[in-house]
């Protein structure tokens, strides 16, 4: 687990993509840590190294076969952190975003931010029990985010935003990186989190 601690009052759990704890995830952990949060990023892959972007197929199959969308470990971490911190927020990217979406219903976290969780479309019955921010890319290959937005529109405690980019638009190390939309999405996430922690 990647941990960045400085005796802050609030904690963020960062859930990575299929690639593991790579430079993008480390960068995101640092950004949120520098804004006043202790950071906990569990290695969901439980392997020595992360996958490279060129290993997408291998990374996807590894995640599907060895990890999946079981929220138990994340929920246990939330429970541990709730004993030490005022607020615990989960932020996920891609598959980590789908996991964070699932945790919005089942865990004791205080808020969820989901960056382009494409598999949320398989879990539209989830009913968030905490403030939940869903950030989607407009150009997804496998589905139409606007249709997903319509299906989730009646959910309480949920905000849904579509940004003009492709899957991974907040990842500075990805060909999909969109600096302008990334800045907008990050600001939205910070505004959302600030309201939760007061």
Each model region followed by its residue ranges:
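Gly/Ala-rich beta-loop-alpha elbow adjacent to hydrolase catalytic centers
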Residues: 92-96, 100
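Short beta-strand/loop motif that positions the catalytic acidic residue
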Residues: 128, 134-136
């Amino acid at each position: 687990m990647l941990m960045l601690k400085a005796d802050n009052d609030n904690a963020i759990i960062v859930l990575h993509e299929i690639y593991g704890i790579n430079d993008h995830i480390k960068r995101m952990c640092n950004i949120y840590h520098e804004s006043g949060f202790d950071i906990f990023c569990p290695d969901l892959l439980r392997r020595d190294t992360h996958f490279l972007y060129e290993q997408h197929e291998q990374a996807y199959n590894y995640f599907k076969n060895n990890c999946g969308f079981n929220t138990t470990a994340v929920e246990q971490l939330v429970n541990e952190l709730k004993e030490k911190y005022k607020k615990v927020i989960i932020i996920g990217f891609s598959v980590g975003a789908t996991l964070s979406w699932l945790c919005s219903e089942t865990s004791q976290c205080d808020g969820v931010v989901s960056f382009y969780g494409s598999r949320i479309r398989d879990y539209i019955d989830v009913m968030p029990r905490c403030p939940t921010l869903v950030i989607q890319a407009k150009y997804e290959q496998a589905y139409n985010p606007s249709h997903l937005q319509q299906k989730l529109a009646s959910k309480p405690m949920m905000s849904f935003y579509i940004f003009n980019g492709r899957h991974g638009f907040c990842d500075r190390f990805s060909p999909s990186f969109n600096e302008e939309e990334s800045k907008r999405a990050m600001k939205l996430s910070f505004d959302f989190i600030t309201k939760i922690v007061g």
